[in-house]
Swiss-Prot record:
Gene Ontology biological process terms in this record: lipid metabolic process; negative regulation of cold-induced thermogenesis; protein homotetramerization
Residues holding CoA: 46, 83, 90-95, 108-113, 137
EC numbers: 3.1.2.-, 3.1.2.2
Top-level lineage group: Eukaryota
Naturally occurring in which organism (per UniProt): Homo sapiens (Human)
Similarity comment: family membership: Belongs to the thioesterase PaaI family.
UniProt name for this protein: Acyl-coenzyme A thioesterase 13
Residues with PTM N6-acetyllysine: K27, K37, K43, K108, K127
Residues bound to substrate: N50, G81
Length: 140
């Protein structure tokens, strides 16, 4: 296990103990971490669903936000930044009990801005559930 992977596992472990909103991410599992790329998995459980039993759109946005930030932490700069813009396109539902894969890539990291892309897919079928783009300000 790389130190990058171990560091992110510590971050996820802290989320499971959080008393704030971050605790909703306590059920994600880190699959791999490489420079500018993070892959996580999560089973859709009842606490993750909306009234019709599918993955809640707000949780999808939270996954895009946080997993893309983890990908930024896995760069040489290692800066999480702050959100400037986030866009999510919802393409198909993830149902209760299904396993999803969340793959985040850093597309470009400049002096002050970083651009990331996140795909949420159904683990069994590979079907695209949602795709997000996240722009973050990295500071000076």
């Amino acid at each position: 296990m790389t130190s990058m992977t171990q560091s992110l596992r510590e971050v996820i472990k802290a989320m499971t103990k959080a008393r704030n909103f971050e605790r909703v991410l306590g059920k994600i599992t880190l699959v791999s971490a490489a420079p500018g790329k993070v892959i996580c998995e999560m089973k859709v459980e009842e606490e993750h669903t909306n009234a019709i039993g599918t993955l809640h759109g707000g949780l999808t946005a939270t996954l895009v936000d946080n997993i893309s930030t983890m990908a930024l932490l896995c760069t040489e700069r290692g800066a999480p930044g702050v959100s400037v813009d986030m866009n999510i396109t919802y393409m198909s539902p993830a149902k209760l009990g299904e396993d999803i894969v969340i793959t985040a890539h850093v597309l470009k990291q400049g002096k002050t801005l970083a651009f990331t892309s996140v795909d949420l897919t159904n683990k069994a079928t590979g079907k695209l559930i949602a795709q997000g783009r996240h722009t973050k300000h990295l500071g000076n």
